Curated annotation (Swiss-Prot):
Keyword S-adenosyl-L-methionine on entry: no
Designated gene of the protein: pyrB
Binding site for L-aspartate: 81, 166, 220
Name the record gives this protein: Aspartate carbamoyltransferase catalytic subunit
UniProt cross-references to InterPro entries, sorted A to Z: Asp/Orn_carbamoyltranf_P-bd, Asp/Orn_carbamoylTrfase, Asp/Orn_carbamoylTrfase_sf, Asp_carbamoyltransf, Asp_carbamoyltransf_Asp/Orn-bd
GO CC list: cytosol
Subunit structure, as described in the record: Heterododecamer (2C3:3R2) of six catalytic PyrB chains organized as two trimers (C3), and six regulatory PyrI chains organized as three dimers (R2).
Organism (species): Anaplasma phagocytophilum (strain HZ)
Role of this protein: Catalyzes the condensation of carbamoyl phosphate and aspartate to form carbamoyl aspartate and inorganic phosphate, the committed step in the de novo pyrimidine nucleotide biosynthesis pathway.
Amino acid sequence: MKKLNKLLRIQSLSDVDIENIVALAHRYLQDSSANNVLQGRVIANLFFENSTRTLLAFEIAEKSLGAVSVTLNVETSSMKKGESVSDTLSTLSAMGVDLVVVRSGFSGFIDEVVERVGDCCVINAGDGNHEHPTQALTDYATIRYLKGKYIEGLNVTICGDIFHSRVARSNMRLLSRYGANINVVTPPCWSASVPSSNVTKITHSLEEGIKDADVIMLLRIQKERMSGASFISANEYSRHYMLDNAKLSIAKDDVIIMHPGPMNRGIEISDEVADASSSILLQVKMGVAVRKAILHYMLG
């Protein structure tokens, strides 16, 4: 049921695409047994940035669906001998790769990939601080699994480094599309970067931001994307914005705590909140299920 050739950004997805992917993901969450729906398909993972959860989720998904899964080690590839990224992509296409999963630190790089791989399917696994659509789909599927099919009217609070977060941007676009109220908690130094079109409220107070929240989505400080001095020190950030049990007591009893990872314990989330939040582990499991669903939907 090939419905989608390129998954580059949230806007790439129709409502039908999203609904089918979420439905498939929920099925795969309930039944994680391997199958051969992608037998004979070749998928290449091309990651120019470090990754644990996203890369592992794709590799597990690819192999459990019967695909030939190849992860190109950039450090040992011909790119270290001077081969251009464009030539590497053209080589993958010529070798008959069916789908390329790409992560890059450069915003918009995914569009250059599309130009080089012809009819090959492409998935954006994160490009700079631009978008991370598969993580947003994971988060949406998790919220729906825990809160029900319709998220219209839910209060979703996103807290942290909005300025550098591709996860936040994709989630704002996706969740607001289905009627969720997006509230942002961020230090003043990052508030200017918040896109007003997808946001209901911006505050610099964690307590104010979470008091009516149905979902709290925490983001780490992305030091690797900061040039020069940090906008805010880790100590100052943790004093004002770390979610601990005392602050969490302000929120609703049934609030969902989410984090795309990696978590920086003691900075944006305390040990006790991290260890008690079963929804964060569900989010990780859903990450594999969603990647299975996406691959099945695009290649199955």
